[in-house]
């Protein structure tokens, strides 16, 4: 255990929340304002017009395993909008297609990590709600960039996981296997012993930061959140920036609707708003953090 907690990892006064519950709560607020949410429909392709986008087409329903229509086939819906906001996460298919078609990735290529997470229910009294621990090292070797966490939630639940950058050199390394080893560490094992797994998941993480941001606007479209590389790789936190970038996008869209102009010229106000907000300050301070670990763990620490 380190004798001191480094400032970026100090979480006193913060909240440990379920992102799933937070999103559901926000969705309820949105629906109270008369806005429709289509949570069962995935976007299959963007509607391209000119140099920009004009909406999205949802995926077809009622297809068999070979992709052929069944009796209950329903074609995807064409949803048009004056401004379409892409918030698909770091590897969204629509965002990647837009960035490629419109050549929006004019900076460094994005680099990724993979995060594996589990939610456990443990015996009563073992974990204090709000407890946070960040781990470094084993089972990752010193050449790898990554680490783990243990968070205490309410109702005797524990969130734990591990993230590792995908630049590791060993082709036989298995992140999922490494996470299973992680749970055998005496510290983690004591927490989980006698508990049960409730759910699990995995996601990619955009490590590129400020220098890997794509252009975030086109005619009729904006890119926010992880899709825009808004993640602090030092603190491994991005939800707050996803929410803030969504708020800034809303301000930009409101101005576009008021003027009746949703062109790239008007929507270019969005990255300016990002630069004037605390998002720029936070990302700029850690712009070289990941690169500092290019030669391994110990070089990065010092």
Task: Report residues per predicted region.
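Predominantly flavin-linked oxidoreductase catalytic cores and closely associated redox partners
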Residues: 20, 24-25, 29-193, 229, ...
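Flexible, glycine/charged-enriched surface loops at secondary-structure junctions
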Residues: 190-201, 260-267
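FAD-binding beta-loop-beta segment adjacent to the flavin cofactor pocket
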Residues: 202-233
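A conserved beta-strand/loop capping segment in the N-terminal third of enzymes
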Residues: 1-12
